[in-house]
Amino acid sequence: MINISFPDGSVRQFENDITAYEVANAISMSLAKAAMVAEINGELKDLSTVIENDCKLRILTAKDSECLEIIRHDAAHIIAEAAKELFPDIQVTIGPAIENGFFYDFAKDKPFTPDDVAMIEARMHEIVKRNEQITRELWNRDKAIEFFKSIGEHYKAEIIASIPAGEQITLYRQGNFIDLCRGPHAPSTGFVKHFKLMKVAGAYWRGDSRNEMLQRIYGTAWATKEQLDNYLLMLEEAEKRDHRKLGKELDLFHFQEEAQGMVFWHDKGWSIYNTIEQYIRKKIRKNGYTEVKTPVLVDKSLWEASGHWEKFRDDMFALDTDDKTLALKPMNCPCHVQIFKQGIKSYRDLPLRMSEFGLCHRNEASGALHGLMRVRSLVQDDAHIFCTEEQITDETVSFCKLLTEVYKDFGFTNISVKFSDRPEVRAGSNGTWDKAENALKEAVEKAGFTYTLNPGEGAFYGPKLEFVLTDAIGRQWQCGTLQMDFVLPERLDASYIAASGEKKRPVMLHRAILGSLERFIGILIEEYAGCFPLWLAPIQVAIATITSDLNDYALEVQKALIDNGVRTDINISPDKINYKIREFYNQKIPMIAVIGKQEQENKQVTIRRLRTTEQEVLSLEQLITLIKEENEKYL
């Protein structure tokens, strides 16, 4: 007798071995028809899986979030089948589910054209209509290698050859197509109804630039038409907000081939950058941080001692000089430990909060670079808190409060937290990890956050919190982090004198709020769609004259504004006023001060605000006071 327990607490008994599908059918025919996969003792399995022993069982349908990845994985198999039917000479390689969709890499002599992609998408819909049964097959490894070689699929044969000898191979068959896969999959292709192919890109075989270039087709797939439509609308809006496009239109920054992954900041973009730095500097000073500056180029011996050389060597820029190897720092933490070690530290000196706008360099692959979001040269709003174990909770709560204030000032109120606990490969004892994880959990709960668990995703030296923002169009951005570190102080021999008189290692909290300033500015450009709030806008007020005989007064207004720290632009050309206003609106300047004869006579300006048709007449003093008060809230 087999006892099967269900999520509602009920238990059913079955006399003989039974498949998950048969269990679903025993509950109701409608459930069996909608069922996609089964969760057996916490693991996702095909519905054809035979249940031989007592277990816990969930039958999952498209309404369950876990099935979205199944739908996308099925879609990857369907695109491969469609492409093979239309282009029999191509080879299929790999095709996983990814965030928001799927992709498949193909080896094809000629590039896929837009017409080819449209044909593949149409054939995918045909395969879905066929509702082909998807079946799991176990194969002998050597037999599988020979089979794929015999049908000209040499990439698949190579993948299987890398699997240890003697292991069974899992293949999935649908119609005349068969693919290597661990699964699970839905019972048939008919479950994948709502998808769209998005683009074609190049991808190296096995992600290695020394290998041949393949063609990758990306797609998106969703459980419902409404979800698909909403996603496509979001992409359309995201395209309008693309920071690379707006960065060019608003004259903020540019990139060029001679300095890949390095930002050329223009005057307006650099204004935003400096304003953010000024804002953060004010915040951290109020919260008891000191600010330091450490070298950019450091001997590799420090990176070897810290463990970064072994772990991140391939991502570091290094050069040999005077029989030494120097490396551009990829992060600031080892340098901050060097400052901590200067002079004897007492428990009375802790917590010590050390911040730096640290210039770091990371050797990102050229294909991974993406505007401001992924660069090789970056500045982090980095800080390290050296504290005792007893201070961990209070310091974490204090950091969470500061982070919440900062995000709110930039307009982000929807913040979620991911808690990443111990990875399989880690430094430190289980007891140390228990203590660290419990302290972080207590602190994040005390700070008023709920969190989702990211099992095994902590750093090798300690658990971490990741703070995720949701933007105006529903996208999520991981920005802030707090990582606990018991290892680096040990490796770099940092210590303090405890109240007992003995030497102890401080705990090191690595923390950032914005992450890299470059990436955060990219996020802000897209969040605001280029319409920055008054305090942050590179040009706060633009002055436009109706006629040229008002130019002297306009210049007087500009000087008064500049003298009071207001960022301004002016157009006193003979162009028509409507043209001037339109040009300033296109530059998304928050306030336009229009000057006519009446304004000159009364020492006033007429203010037009971005995104509104309302006008407001202010004296010059009122305008200056209004902007200064807004600036002082943040700066």
Swiss-Prot record:
This is Threonine--tRNA ligase. It comes from Rickettsia akari (strain Hartford). SUPFAM superfamilies: Class II aaRS ABD-related, Class II aaRS and biotin synthetases, TGS-like, ThrRS/AlaRS common domain. Zn(2+) binds at C333, H384, H510. Disulfide bonds: none annotated. Homodimer. Residues 1-61 form the TGS domain. It is found in: Cytoplasm. Gene3D superfamilies: 3.10.20.30, 3.30.54.20, Anticodon-binding domain, Bira Bifunctional Protein, Domain 2, Threonyl-trna Synthetase, Chain A, domain 2. Its cofactor is Zn(2+). Keywords: Aminoacyl-tRNA synthetase, ATP-binding, Cytoplasm, Ligase, Metal-binding, Nucleotide-binding, Protein biosynthesis, RNA-binding, tRNA-binding, Zinc. One of its GO terms (molecular function) is ATP binding. Residues 242-533 are annotated as: Catalytic. Catalyzes the attachment of threonine to tRNA(Thr) in a two-step reaction: L-threonine is first activated by ATP to form Thr-AMP and then transferred to the acceptor end of tRNA(Thr). Also edits incorrectly charged L-seryl-tRNA(Thr).
